[in-house]
């Protein structure tokens, strides 16, 4: 599901330049249905791909262009937070800043979140960040830059576990039994070509946890 949600965000979350409203598509219906049945407002993918009042600013494409032109740039940042539009969103974005740095040939990503549900949100946020790093590294290699995936640093201003998920949280903290080494196989697609599939996990057999999203 993380791949499909990332694709949903990278593709504009079902919005268009002239209709800047994120919509729940079949790819993310299970994840986003607690908040809405259809429209979510100008959130995530709208800010990423159809920014500004007229919807013409493509932040993802802008960042890709900056990194392709100069991988050492310190200006490769996109955001999902626009204060004047937060009131029109069904839920304000939790991760709000994605800042890129290429240092020593390694593609690094810093994600800053205003709020993080450690049980229901953090696993997706960090996995999607890891996938973004691989996608960006693929893009830069396609343009002749000798880079490899680097580090993901995730920072949150408010990490929390809701009371109804404390039991799940305690079980998640228990050491997992690993019978075989887990191998993650990244896709060869780039950021702008990603179609929501291609990443694979081999020998991954984690327990299934049932946690409830808290709508606040």
Question: What do the predicted segments below correspond to?
Answer:
Residues 1-216:
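Terminal, non-catalytic protein-protein interaction segments that mediate quaternary/complex assembly
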């Amino acid at each position: 599901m993380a791949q499909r949600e990332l694709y949903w965000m990278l593709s504009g979350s079902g919005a268009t330049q002239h209709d800047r409203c994120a919509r729940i598509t079949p790819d993310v219906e299970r994840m986003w249905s607690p908040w809405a049945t259809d429209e979510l407002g100008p959130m995530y993918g709208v800010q990423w791909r159809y920014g500004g009042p007229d919807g013409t600013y493509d932040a993802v494409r802008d960042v890709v262009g900056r990194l392709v032109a100069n991988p050492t740039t310190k200006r490769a940042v996109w955001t999902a937070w626009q204060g004047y539009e937060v009131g029109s969103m069904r839920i304000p974005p939790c991760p709000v800043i994605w800042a890129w740095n290429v240092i020593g040939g390694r593609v690094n990503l810093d994600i800053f979140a205003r709020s993080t549900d450690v049980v229901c949100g953090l696993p997706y946020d960090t996995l999607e960040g890891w996938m973004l790093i691989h996608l960006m590294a693929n893009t830069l290699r396609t343009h002749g830059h000798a880079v490899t995936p680097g580090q993901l640093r995730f920072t949150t201003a408010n990490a929390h576990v809701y009371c109804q998920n404390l039991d799940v949280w305690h079980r998640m903290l228990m050491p997992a039994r690993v019978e075989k080494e887990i191998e993650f196989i990244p896709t060869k697609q780039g950021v702008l070509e990603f179609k929501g599939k291609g990443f694979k996990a081999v020998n991954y057999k984690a327990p299934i946890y049932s946690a409830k999203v808290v709508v606040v």
